[in-house]
Amino acid sequence: MPLDRVKWRPPKQNGAVDRRVVVNPAQARELLTAVSYVGRSRGPRLRAMFACMYFAGLRPAEAAGLRRHDCELPATGWGLITLKKTRPQTNKRYTDSGETFDDRGLKHRDDDLVRPVPVPPELVAILREHLDAFGTAKDGRLFVTNGGRSFSGSAYAQVWKQARALALTPDQVESPLAARPYDLRHAAVSLWLNAGVHAPEAAERAGHGVDVMLRVYAKCIDGQRDVANQRIEDALA
């Protein structure tokens, strides 16, 4: 058969996360500290946004849309973020408002549904510090520029690039390790699963279906065979 008549189909991608992108907690904290040293105000204003991706597993658009009334931030203990809207960047010709950013419902959910995400005390403290230092935009959004506008994707990607150069070794900078801000979310979900958080609970926090989550993060789960073997052995005893 002539080659020009052969139908070639690209291999299907399962969307699985490459475990090489996943940072450990020490690396994540070093990166967040490095973010605060980037620029006069851009890095300090974005540190808490990146922290939301790591400690709460938020998608970048979910963090960008976060408002003060979405956050319960007690002086001590765990807090709660209730996600209602995301703020993805797109061409302003295709938004309802005509702006570059537009409010959308949560990914994979009906517009009127919300997603509660418990947040650890470390993130609560970071968010409280952020609010003390920068306040909010007029509409309550937490993460905005000095002029009250949303950060563009290219702006926070550039901050992240500079933070990696500050926090990581030269070899790590050239590696896939935390190459994108989104990889902080991957690190969060991987940590939850490896810590033994039950899959349905981890999926609810991450805004995933259980089957999708386990497929996407299968390569990032350590030692599950040994754990399973021990549980079976204990049950047979």
Residue ranges, per PLM feature:
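Conserved tyrosine-mediated DNA breakage-rejoining catalytic core shared by Y-recombinases
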Residues: D4-P11, P25, S36, G65-D132, ...
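Intrinsically disordered, low-complexity basic tails/linkers immediately adjacent to helix-turn-helix/homeobox/MYB/SANT
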Residues: I232-A237
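Basic, Lys/Arg- and aromatic-enriched nucleic-acid-binding interface segment
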Residues: M1-L66, T76-W78, D102, D110-V114, ...
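Residue-level detector of conserved, well-ordered beta-strand and adjacent loop positions
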Residues: V17, N24, L32, K84, ...
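Catalytic-site neighborhood detector that most strongly recognizes the C-terminal catalytic loop/helix
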Residues: C71, R87-Q89, A199, A206-R231
